[in-house]
Amino acid sequence: MNLKTPTISHVRLISLYWSRYALRSGAGLVYLLIALIFGLSVAHILIMPVEQLMALQKRQIGKTDPQLIRKTIVDIGQPIVQFVLGIKSFEEVTKEAAALQPGPPDNTSTAAQTGKNAAGFDPWTNFLIEKKPALLSVIFLILLFGMPFVISFLAFNQISGDIQNHGLRYLLLRTKRSNIYFGRFLGTAIFSTVVMAIIVATITFYLGMKTRIYPALDLAGWAVQGFLALAILMIPYIAVCSLISASVDSPFLSLVLAKVAIAGVLLIAILGSFAWKPSKYLLYALPWGWQNNLLHPAPAHWLGAALASLAYTAFFLMLGYYRFERRDL
């Protein structure tokens, strides 16, 4: 079978049309609504306690102390971030939280605990919650985990709907399968990237204007890096949905299979690791195993994660295209 080379002008035209069509389609609107609700809800849940702490400070001392607020965020966020990054286990985080609970004063144990915490403050955690705006870092970590579950609402129906109603036969009179396949993938990626930009910009603007605990330039710079991490991460998951959508005839089945594939890999790896430790490596079947590295301080790590995203994208995209070229429409 001959895999045909896409025509750049056709791919560009189809991608621009598809990205605009996504905004008018039911799938695009559902994705936009779910993504906005999820992203802004995460931000609200994390920012609200900070606002309450600021209000409490204002009542008690007549003003807010940004330095004290930032320190409180770091103290609370450190074990959580270390758990999310896989640096510490849940048991270790629980023990540290218990050690911080009020109790009888013990200078020896307190000093030992302080030394232990300082020694365990790894460079990655230090980068995320000390060198960068900690609140925004935690929001980004949650979005990196949650957005792959949301992206399938946008990307599930790139091809399958037109296969079901045989609409592609009319399009193929004017263009090639390769142009349709890659154009729709690119259009979906463009729409997803725009939505990520809206979410990150809204959260950053609100955090900066409402709390004023971080310098504006620090927030803006970290927001750009977080946006790039989210935008890059969505691309391989969109490619997975492209593969599934090109392989089945039903949009509903495509959505179900996309959900099962994305969530199933994570679930099987986590549950399987309790019985057999090597099961955790199943996470690397999808970007789950390394996606947090997109926020790593070392260039080798975040660049490696970005290149891995492109490699996963190329693999799933070409697998889907091979299937799409061979199948009967």
Q: Which residues does each PLM region occupy?
A:
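Helix-loop-helix units of permease transmembrane domains in multi-pass membrane transporters
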Residues: 158-190
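Alpha-helical transmembrane segments of multipass membrane proteins
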Residues: 18, 201-205, 239-243, 263, ...
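Hydrophobic core positions of alpha-helical segments in small-molecule transporters
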Residues: 31-34, 182-183, 254-257, 308, ...
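Secretory targeting signals
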Residues: 41-71, 106, 110-157, 181-252, ...
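Aromatic- and glycine-rich beta-strand/loop motifs that create alpha-glucan
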Residues: 1-35
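Transmembrane helix-loop junction
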Residues: 21, 161, 173, 204, ...
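Hydrophobic alpha-helical membrane-insertion segments
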Residues: 31-47, 188-198, 257-273
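Terminal transmembrane helical anchor/hairpin motif
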Residues: 8, 45-78, 82-134, 257-329
